[in-house]
Structure formats: structure tokens, C-alpha cells
């Protein structure tokens, strides 16, 4: 018998059980099960950060988990079921509990991995496929045979300087440019100082890999890189033409943004190359990034820089019900 409960506060045991579930799903599926945003809310104490936590238990064991966030008019969720308890109605039970909480507003559910099982669950419950987030990759050695270094040198305008982010100094300027650059992005453009501070407190945060482009002291753009100690998605779907990832660290183009004053100048491409060269120079063999499938301009840029599809996450949407 599966029981469902909303957690109004998280204790160490809750977090350990959810983390163990996510680890089991990652081993089975080759992906993390939920996003970084959700993982950052798994902290002891009263539930906060705009995220609610739902667990499914079989006896005392946590066999399913859902995180619910979003806005008052557009809710967003992520859910995962333990590999040993799939095809037993746990996923459907979680979805129905989300319906009960979110109705009548619309609900988006992210599936990490573009799988037939996720698509079937979505279709059975009235969801439409709405958004695809691609994971692209490339090696940091040459991707062209015979070319020992196919990362071009970045072309930086003479009046633009590149420097590293300074904690305690650059947060407000960065948030302003980030909001401008991602004004139409459903997640990135809504970052707050708390969101930024949370990343600054993570073990992976390294300001030396967080590049800012300035003109006369004004921030024009940025490239924030990240290093994963272990590849978060080492296996790839058979439908892609990319080799499987390798155990060990991998770099990430975490986020690249350009202010409207510098749009169309090539600064975004230059900053991307600056970050790729940094990741290569610190000894990483490959790099990944996430980009919306319908962001044709960005996909073209990354394709020109040697990136290829490795995996995909899919958002399914159930419209508001009157």
C-alpha cells in the first residue's frame, strides 16, 4: 500500500531518504532525476524556497518523490519513482496528488530524460509535450581530425575587458544583466539574490571560472562555468550520435548572457570560447551545456563550436481547468 504525504518541514532523515531515492534513479536512468533548483531546497527545517515536497511511501520506505513550485498561475513540478517500484501506480498517484493541489491552474511536469515511459504517463493524464531542453556536449580536445586546437581565439573588442566575478561585489550588477538577458526565460530570468547566494555556497562554485565582460565599468555579459566532479549523465540515449560519457569530472557552460546593449556584437560567442578554453586549461576532457531546443540562434552557435546532442529533458503541460 502506497501512502502520500506533503512535508511541511524537512529533517535529516527525510533528506537522506529522498537523496537515496534520487541516487537510485540516477543509477538506473543515467540522470539526476530532479534539477539543481530542487536539490538546493533539500535543506533541514521548514519548507521554503517556493518549493513543496511530496513523498510516496511503501511502509517506511520512500518510493516516490515530487517537488512542486512555480507561480500562482503556472505551477511546475518534477517527480521521480524508485526503479524497484515502477509500473505499480506510484507515478500516477503522485500526478493525481499534484492535480488535487494545483487545480484549476496549469501544471508543467519536467521529465529528466526523453523516455517512452514518461511520455506515456503524461499522455494518460492529459499533458501535452511543450518544451524540450537539450543537453549538448563536445570534447575539449579537437573535434576536427588533424587540428590540435579547434577552439578559436575569442575576439574581444578593444574597449571590453574580461575579469573574474568578485563575491560580495558583483552580485547586483550580475542579477540585473541576467534578468535582462533572460527576460523571456521561464526560470533563469527570475533569479534573485537568494538564488545566487545559494550557488555561491555550493562546493562547486569557483569565481575563477565565472567571467564578466565590462566596458568602462559597466557589465555587458558573462559566462559562468561549472565543474561536475562526476559526470551527471554518463550514459546517452541510443538515438543520439554521441559517445557515452566517461566517469569522472566534466565541465559545463552553466550560463552565458549578454546585455541588450551588446546583443548581436559577437560578445556571447567570445565569452563562450573564453569559458571553454578555461575548462580545457584546468584539465577537463569534455564539456556540456543545456539549451532550449527552440532557441535556434543559440543551438546554431553551439553547433558551430562543435557541440552535439547528448540527451534531452522534456516539459509536459496540462492546461488550466475551469
Swiss-Prot record:
<keyword id="KW-0012">Acyltransferase</keyword>
<protein>
    <recommendedName>
        <fullName>Mycothiol acetyltransferase</fullName>
        <ecNumber>2.3.1.189</ecNumber>
    </recommendedName>
</protein>
<dbReference type="InterPro" id="IPR050832">
    <property type="entry name" value="Bact_Acetyltransf"/>
</dbReference>
<dbReference type="InterPro" id="IPR000182">
    <property type="entry name" value="GNAT_dom"/>
</dbReference>
<feature type="binding site">
    <location>
        <begin position="79"/>
        <end position="81"/>
    </location>
    <ligand>
        <name>acetyl-CoA 1</name>
    </ligand>
</feature>
<dbReference type="Pfam" id="PF13508">
    <property type="entry name" value="Acetyltransf_7"/>
</dbReference>
<feature type="binding site">
    <location>
        <begin position="256"/>
        <end position="258"/>
    </location>
    <ligand>
        <name>acetyl-CoA 2</name>
    </ligand>
</feature>
<dbReference type="InterPro" id="IPR016181">
    <property type="entry name" value="Acyl_CoA_acyltransferase"/>
</dbReference>
<feature type="binding site">
    <location>
        <position position="226"/>
    </location>
    <ligand>
        <name>1D-myo-inositol 2-(L-cysteinylamino)-2-deoxy-alpha-D-glucopyranoside</name>
    </ligand>
</feature>
<dbReference type="GO" id="GO:0035447">
    <property type="term" value="F:mycothiol synthase activity"/>
</dbReference>
<comment type="subunit">
    <text>Monomer.</text>
</comment>
<feature type="binding site">
    <location>
        <begin position="87"/>
        <end position="92"/>
    </location>
    <ligand>
        <name>acetyl-CoA 1</name>
    </ligand>
</feature>
<keyword id="KW-0808">Transferase</keyword>
<comment type="similarity">
    <text>Belongs to the acetyltransferase family. MshD subfamily.</text>
</comment>
<keyword id="KW-0677">Repeat</keyword>
<dbReference type="Pfam" id="PF00583">
    <property type="entry name" value="Acetyltransf_1"/>
</dbReference>
<feature type="domain" description="N-acetyltransferase 2">
    <location>
        <begin position="160"/>
        <end position="322"/>
    </location>
</feature>
<feature type="binding site">
    <location>
        <begin position="295"/>
        <end position="300"/>
    </location>
    <ligand>
        <name>acetyl-CoA 2</name>
    </ligand>
</feature>
<feature type="binding site">
    <location>
        <position position="252"/>
    </location>
    <ligand>
        <name>1D-myo-inositol 2-(L-cysteinylamino)-2-deoxy-alpha-D-glucopyranoside</name>
    </ligand>
</feature>
<feature type="binding site">
    <location>
        <position position="187"/>
    </location>
    <ligand>
        <name>1D-myo-inositol 2-(L-cysteinylamino)-2-deoxy-alpha-D-glucopyranoside</name>
    </ligand>
</feature>
<feature type="binding site">
    <location>
        <position position="290"/>
    </location>
    <ligand>
        <name>1D-myo-inositol 2-(L-cysteinylamino)-2-deoxy-alpha-D-glucopyranoside</name>
    </ligand>
</feature>
<feature type="domain" description="N-acetyltransferase 1">
    <location>
        <begin position="5"/>
        <end position="150"/>
    </location>
</feature>
<feature type="binding site">
    <location>
        <position position="36"/>
    </location>
    <ligand>
        <name>1D-myo-inositol 2-(L-cysteinylamino)-2-deoxy-alpha-D-glucopyranoside</name>
    </ligand>
</feature>
<comment type="function">
    <text>Catalyzes the transfer of acetyl from acetyl-CoA to desacetylmycothiol (Cys-GlcN-Ins) to form mycothiol.</text>
</comment>
<dbReference type="GO" id="GO:0010125">
    <property type="term" value="P:mycothiol biosynthetic process"/>
</dbReference>
<dbReference type="InterPro" id="IPR017813">
    <property type="entry name" value="Mycothiol_AcTrfase"/>
</dbReference>
